[in-house]
Amino acid sequence: MIALIQRVTRASVTVEDEVTGEIGPGLLVLLGVEKEDDEQKANRLCERVLGYRIFSDADGKMNLNVQQAGGSVLVVSQFTLAADTERGMRPSFSGGAAPDRAQALYEYFVGRCRQQAINTQTGRFAADMQVELVNDGPVTFWLQV
């Protein structure tokens, strides 16, 4: 399971001209689900995403996690993160989970974020989405479990 996380001052996702999720300061999480992923990996990745200390403390050091910083989370499914790009000029998506399994794990991950009392907004699984964000820093990390 892969999360590309970006520290943002604001972010939103729109599907068919409808805003489905919008946050102020916090994390934009682009989530990719791979074939071998399960709830245990989703738990571990959620723990890492929410615990990752990439927000500035009073001294300006990256020392706070999203909850300590009072931030929110916007989770957007992105199957392209599971692409194999090692050969050729076209990515292969054979490493991605089947759509039904990927959706179940995506929803599980979102639920785990919400259980941690984090304001969690979402896109719409498998939809054509437009994501807008202001990357703060820029600060972007690739987390994989």
UniProtKB/Swiss-Prot annotation:
Pfam families the record matches: Tyr_Deacylase
Entry function: An aminoacyl-tRNA editing enzyme that deacylates mischarged D-aminoacyl-tRNAs. Also deacylates mischarged glycyl-tRNA(Ala), protecting cells against glycine mischarging by AlaRS. Acts via tRNA-based rather than protein-based catalysis; rejects L-amino acids rather than detecting D-amino acids in the active site. By recycling D-aminoacyl-tRNA to D-amino acids and free tRNA molecules, this enzyme counteracts the toxicity associated with the formation of D-aminoacyl-tRNA entities in vivo and helps enforce protein L-homochirality.
Keywords attached to this entry: Cytoplasm, Hydrolase, RNA-binding, tRNA-binding
Domain remark from Swiss-Prot or TrEMBL: A Gly-cisPro motif from one monomer fits into the active site of the other monomer to allow specific chiral rejection of L-amino acids.
Disulfide bridge map: none
Higher taxonomy: Bacteria, Pseudomonadati, Pseudomonadota, Gammaproteobacteria, Enterobacterales
Entry EC number(s): 3.1.1.96
Protein name per UniProt: D-aminoacyl-tRNA deacylase
GO BP terms, alphabetized: D-amino acid catabolic process
Subunit structure: Homodimer.
A cellular component annotation (GO) from this entry: cytoplasm
